[in-house]
């Protein structure tokens, strides 16, 4: 059995886009679960660089770097790892569309919480408590 120190860290960055009380979620190709859009850092990328690249790759839009604001950082245990998700809001330009990596995008309310992973559920909890996410 691994101790907490031995657990692998999955370090991710996510884009929190809320419109009309709903949060944007994406389902990658070949997966059954929806995620907050974003992904893992490549090399020595900063959070901002990761966010801009991942959102361009997944949703074909451009994040406006000057509008990026940190929402919070969340951690959750999964088997054999800890997932850390640094969350940011930002404006964007372009039209949201799925890329070759994404099967489907959808706008979720708090009622859809069971359809996202544990780390995303923590964000959902905070957003509904702040009145930003519809129940």
Where do the protein language model's features map onto the residues?
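Active-site-adjacent beta-strand/loop module that shapes the phosphate/pyrophosphate-binding cleft
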Residues: 11, 74-98, 103-107, 123, ...
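Short histidine/acidic/glycine/proline-rich micro-motifs that form metal-
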Residues: 41-42, 75-76, 112-114
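Conserved Nudix-box catalytic region and its N-terminal flanking loop in Nudix hydrolases
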Residues: 18-58
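Nudix hydrolase/Nudix homology domain
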Residues: 29-34, 98-135
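Conserved N-terminal beta-strand and adjoining loop/helix that marks the start
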Residues: 2-23
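Short, solvent-exposed loop/helix junctions and linker helices
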Residues: 9, 44-45, 49, 82, ...
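A short coil-to-beta-strand element that immediately follows conserved catalytic motifs
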Residues: 62-72, 88
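Short loop segments at secondary-structure junctions
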Residues: 19-22, 91-95, 110-112
């Amino acid at each position: 059995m691994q101790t907490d120190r031995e657990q692998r860290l999955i370090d991710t960055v996510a884009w929190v886009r809320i419109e009309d009380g709903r949060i944007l979620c994406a389902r990658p190709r070949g997966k059954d679960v929806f995620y907050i859009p974003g992904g893992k850092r490549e090399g020595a990328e900063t959070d901002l660089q990761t966010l801009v690249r991942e959102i361009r790759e997944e949703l074909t839009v451009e994040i406006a770097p000057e509008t990026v604001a940190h929402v919070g950082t969340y951690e959750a245990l999964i088997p054999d790892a800890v997932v850390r998700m640094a969350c940011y809001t930002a404006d964007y330009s372009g039209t949201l569309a799925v890329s070759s990596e994404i099967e489907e995008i959808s706008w979720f309310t708090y009622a859809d919480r069971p359809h996202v992973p544990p780390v995303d559920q923590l964000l959902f909890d905070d957003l509904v408590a702040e009145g930003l996410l519809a129940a």
